[in-house]
Structures are given as C-alpha cells and as structure tokens.
Amino acid sequence: MVAAVVLAAGASSRYGTDPPKQHVHLAAVLAALEASVVDEVVVVSGAHPLPIESVHCPDWEQGPGASLRCGLAALSDETEAAIVVLADGPDLDPRAVDRVIEHWRADGGDDILVANYETGTRFHPVLIPRALWPSTPDEGFKGWQPGRLVDCSDLTPPGDVDFSPAGS
C-alpha cells in the first residue's frame, strides 16, 4: 500500500495572503492524487488548520521535516511507502505520481525515489519507503539524497507557487 502525504502546514508568510497559498491549490493537488494509484491520502495542516479531515502538526514552525513526520506518523501500519507532494504545487500530474509508485513497486528497495523532469529538475512527487521514516531530516525530503530518479521528462513539473510564475 502506498499513501500520499500532502504538506500544507506552512504560514504562507512570503505571500501574506488569505487564504493561505497552499489551500488555494489544494483542490487541484487532491484531484491529481485521486486520479492516481495512491491508496490513502493524508493532508498535514499547521499554521492554518483545514476544515477537512487532516493531520494537524503543532510543530509546523519547525519546518517541513516536522510536517513530514506528522504526516508519516498518521499513516496506517499497512503502509509500505509514502508518496510526498506539496500543497502549493498546483500542476501535479497524476501520471508522475503513478510512475514513481510503479517504479518502486517494480523494483522495491529502501531508496528514495524522486521524479526527474525534462529540465533536469528533481521535484515532487517523492516516494519514501517506510524503512527511512524514522530518519526524517529537519528539512523534510530535501535532506535525503535521492536513491533513484524516475524519468518524468515527458511531463510538466508540478510547479511551486513560491517560485513559479504559473502559480502567481
């Protein structure tokens, strides 16, 4: 079983907007995950609690690692791997999610898998096998070295509204 962890706990302080930027794009991210092969979805909130069933991360100010640990801790015991996506990545393609999961299912192992796009950009989705969950770095999945890159060069990267003109 593979579960998705959607990180939506930040304060959106760079934007100073209401609603928070990650909540604006959350519906698109959730729709992409619904269209993928993930078995379960957990949304991690923090600075701005969500009016949906989500995991609240009281330590969200400690950074993405804290949010990731909250999300991973909420997953069922049957979950073998987590596919992590960002709530402020509005153009998530479910084919990228499926491709990363299928690559892991075919080869197994305890390596981090990262989508690798045409631009050479390594970006989410990121698959983290259960064996690595206890060693989650404070900076979240950015702190891990990817063990394997999954070719998503035919797909558009999901973007990040902090940095992508498409998200503004």
Language-model segments: residues:
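Short beta-strand segments
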Residues: 7-9, 44, 85-87, 115-117, ...
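Conserved beta-loop-beta/alpha segment of the NTase-like Rossmann-fold superfamily
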Residues: 61-130, 134-135
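Short glycine-rich anion-binding loops that position phosphate/pyrophosphate groups of nucleotides
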Residues: 10-13, 47-48, 60, 87-90
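Conserved alpha/beta core of the MobA/IspD/sugar-nucleotide pyrophosphorylase nucleotidyltransferase superfamily
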Residues: 133-168
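Active-site regions of enzymes building and remodeling cell-envelope glycoconjugates
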Residues: 51-60, 148
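Short, hydrophobic beta-strand segments that form beta-sheet elements in well-ordered domains
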Residues: 39-47, 115, 136
